[in-house]
Amino acid sequence: MGVWKSMVWGVLLWHSQSGAICPVWPSARTIEEIARLQQQLADWNDIYWKQGVSAVDDSVYDQLSAKLVQWQRCVGQDVSSTPVSPPLNGTTTHPVAHTGVRKLADRQAVAQWMRGHSEFWVQPKVDGVAVTLVYQNGKLTRAISRGNGLQGEDWTQKIRQISSIPQTTRGALANAVLQGEIFLQLKGHIQQRMGGMNARSKVAGMLMRQKNTSALNSLGIFIWAWPDGPANMTERLSQLAKAGFSLTQKYSQMVKNASEVERARRSWLTSALPFVTDGVVIRMAKEPSSQYWRPGQGDWLAAWKYPPVAQVAQVSAIQFSVGKSGKISVIASLVPVMLDDKRVKRVNIGSVKRWEAWDIAPGDQILVSLAGQGIPRLDEVVWRSRERSKPVPPGNHFNSLTCFYASATCQEQFISRLVWLGSRAALGLDGMGEASWRALHQTHRFEHIFSWLALTPAEIANTPGFAKGKSELIWRQFNLARRQPFSRWVMAMDIPLTQAALQASGDRSWEQLLMRTDQHWRQLPATGERRAGRVSDWRDNPRIKALSRWLAAQHIPGFGT
């Protein structure tokens, strides 16, 4: 399907600065867009932490937060005020600070981080809400939300209502500080197939609401740190399991290299687990004394996250395509993003009406995922740019009987017709994709959709971008097409019949086809009164008649007298 190049609007240019992809906007607009996105994130953040309600999917929030930091770095702004963490309104001090975890981008980064050390453990990165549990004299005395890592909210009363969290401990755990993740308990959750399910927001909502405390029993705990616990990790896991924190032992594996980390990561991504995860955490077996723990300084652990199921992508331009039937489709060109191993640069929005309903303009941020067969799909608009400059779509004068002949306004539908006639459903011209048809048409200025039949081997060879081997292949394909049966040529002319109906009709010549009545067409498979009328309109169209005469002059089977 061709693209309406002349109607592209608002193409955004991009450049790289310090590894970031930066929008090339006037400085005033850049600062304004940063401020607007920062305010939007702050509003979502406030609702999330104060009301326990998520106004946006967790993954979308995380990706937009990262994009804000990226933009701020592009213009040299301080990123410390970026609202990617909860408000600092907790007043209960953590006995041991939460360090957070550094993010590693890929297997190579994991291998580099592990270099020089020999013993590591890998665990699922459980997606929930972080908490500190304080046990004194064998009893749970305090539970503190992560907050800013140094101080958080007192969640003791809520945590005591979660039946899966032990209220008493013995032995080394009788007086201990534990850090972990409160998560939504699930049965048979397969991360790759089911995604994040907004689990983090659901957990936060349950912990912050004053009512419906019975729902807290659907929560569980995964302990990922025991500051100043047993030096031997195996012993540490064993004691946690005996105390009722069994998940930590079950989902912790000793690893020696990045390959083993990758194997565990893949296994947990595709296996049934009791919680949502968003990657893995690799921990060095030896960690410093808790007195040295500080937010942002946990150098002995790192995370390797899963690629998101959906990516936030920036719209760089809006384009229009016209199919062979005259249908206009809208396409969003994107600043490229990776989904699985696919580089996504564009997504089909659909009809002009659907595009107008979505209200998408260059500069907007949209959520894109992969549908069946790896086709990019638009899921939602997650943030709109202040500037709403949109292109004007082409007129609606295109239909199934237009653009068999080339003209300035017919450029895209004409190319779409060429692509169609070269497909296996019509003449089966191997090696003839849209780019090849464009090159031939731009060089040799076709009059109509069959003008290529008149090209000589020398003319094909002189087409820019055509190597000798390709030129010879195309020449052979064009010659072979002359031997195709009449029905194939009629399909190439876009007769409004299915192949099955055309075969059932039994027509072997243009003369036979001209003699058919609407009653005959109506009797064919999948051909009602409306389609029969379309066939007659197609057959009687002056452009179609002219093409049939031209094919007769070329001695195409079924068109001669």
Swiss-Prot record:
<keyword id="KW-0227">DNA damage</keyword>
<keyword id="KW-0520">NAD</keyword>
<dbReference type="Pfam" id="PF03120">
    <property type="entry name" value="DNA_ligase_OB"/>
</dbReference>
<comment type="similarity">
    <text>Belongs to the NAD-dependent DNA ligase family. LigB subfamily.</text>
</comment>
<protein>
    <recommendedName>
        <fullName>DNA ligase B</fullName>
        <ecNumber>6.5.1.2</ecNumber>
    </recommendedName>
</protein>
<dbReference type="InterPro" id="IPR004150">
    <property type="entry name" value="NAD_DNA_ligase_OB"/>
</dbReference>
<dbReference type="GO" id="GO:0003911">
    <property type="term" value="F:DNA ligase (NAD+) activity"/>
</dbReference>
<feature type="active site" description="N6-AMP-lysine intermediate">
    <location>
        <position position="125"/>
    </location>
</feature>
<comment type="function">
    <text>Catalyzes the formation of phosphodiester linkages between 5'-phosphoryl and 3'-hydroxyl groups in double-stranded DNA using NAD as a coenzyme and as the energy source for the reaction.</text>
</comment>
<dbReference type="InterPro" id="IPR010994">
    <property type="entry name" value="RuvA_2-like"/>
</dbReference>
<dbReference type="InterPro" id="IPR018239">
    <property type="entry name" value="DNA_ligase_AS"/>
</dbReference>
<dbReference type="InterPro" id="IPR013840">
    <property type="entry name" value="DNAligase_N"/>
</dbReference>
<dbReference type="GO" id="GO:0006260">
    <property type="term" value="P:DNA replication"/>
</dbReference>
<dbReference type="InterPro" id="IPR020923">
    <property type="entry name" value="DNA_ligase_B"/>
</dbReference>
<dbReference type="InterPro" id="IPR013839">
    <property type="entry name" value="DNAligase_adenylation"/>
</dbReference>
<dbReference type="InterPro" id="IPR012340">
    <property type="entry name" value="NA-bd_OB-fold"/>
</dbReference>
<dbReference type="InterPro" id="IPR050326">
    <property type="entry name" value="NAD_dep_DNA_ligaseB"/>
</dbReference>
<dbReference type="Pfam" id="PF01653">
    <property type="entry name" value="DNA_ligase_aden"/>
</dbReference>
<dbReference type="GO" id="GO:0006281">
    <property type="term" value="P:DNA repair"/>
</dbReference>
<keyword id="KW-0436">Ligase</keyword>
<keyword id="KW-0234">DNA repair</keyword>
<keyword id="KW-0235">DNA replication</keyword>
